[in-house]
Amino acid sequence: MSFEEKIICAFQILKKKMAWNGRYQLYSKELEKVIPKGNGSNADLNFILISILKDFGLEAYPVVLSRRSSGMLPYNFPSLQKLNTFIIAVYDINKQKYVFLDGSMDVPALNILPLELSVNKARILSPKVKEEKKWVNVMALADNKSFMKIEARMEGNQVKGHRSTILYGQEAVEYQANEKDKQDSI
């Protein structure tokens, strides 16, 4: 299995058993009670996902941050009190870089985070990362784009044609989640 396939497989294992309860937290209060319930905060899901990723032989670490709705971390004196959740960094040995993800998402996506967690200052909690590289910007990890092509022709008083759309990044993840919700409601 490739690096990406291992991460997606680990994410799918998590999502078969667990659901996100809509809450963001920095730590898990009672992780042993979360698994039998089948749902938990993003911290609960991320701790479980880190464990699964490590079982797959991958290096996975928490990345602490302050959610967008809670304001930016001060640059001069970042405070522990301002940290209120975390995402996951997984190290790709072949590419010598990290990819980021969050267990609260419905669809497994590398380097695409919920908008609430897309911030310009987060800190990787890994003993292997040099001090000067522990602060990371997870705001611009992936391109968020949409391309639309319209082919139209006039037929009498009507315009007929075809539209095709290509989505990248957050746009694509949101579309996939909406399509999944439509299928689940049938």
Please annotate each region the language model reported.
Residues 1-186:
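A sensor for short, sequence-defined functional sites
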